[in-house]
């Protein structure tokens, strides 16, 4: 399953009416054209703000988790995170209308993550985004 998260730019239409000669294939006619309504497939580098002063030393941005969840799952799907840390994946799952199951081994981190997830649940229930 792949739901690309398109970016948008200027629409365009290009035509390449070139002909030429190739040592491998001989004479050729190239009359291909390209057009775009402005949608662009995602590139291979994502730019998202980093988390500073987070709950967990390796905390990821919610926006990054939302991107991957929207790209590789359907709404209503279950998202699993076996190393939940601060609960970012759970927050992102709620923000994108997915269910989640998370595991965290460290009791001190688990307690903080559970509080964060509950705050996010209340925000999402109230029509806002969890953070």
Sequence positions of predicted segments:
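Core catalytic lobe of class I
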Residues: 1-111
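S-adenosyl-L-methionine
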Residues: 115-131
């Amino acid at each position: 399953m792949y739901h690309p998260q398109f970016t948008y730019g200027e629409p365009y239409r290009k035509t390449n009416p070139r002909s030429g000669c190739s040592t491998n294939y001989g004479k050729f006619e190239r009359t291909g054209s390209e057009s775009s309504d402005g949608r662009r497939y995602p590139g291979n580098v994502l730019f998202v703000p980093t988390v500073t002063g987070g709950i967990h030393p390796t905390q990821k941005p919610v926006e990054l988790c939302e991107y991957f969840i929207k790209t590789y799952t359907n709404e209503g799907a279950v998202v699993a995170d076996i190393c939940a840390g601060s609960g970012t994946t759970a927050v992102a799952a709620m923000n994108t209308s997915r269910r989640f199951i998370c595991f965290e081994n460290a009791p001190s981190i688990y307690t903080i993550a559970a509080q964060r997830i509950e705050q996010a649940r209340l925000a999402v229930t109230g029509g806002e985004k969890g953070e």
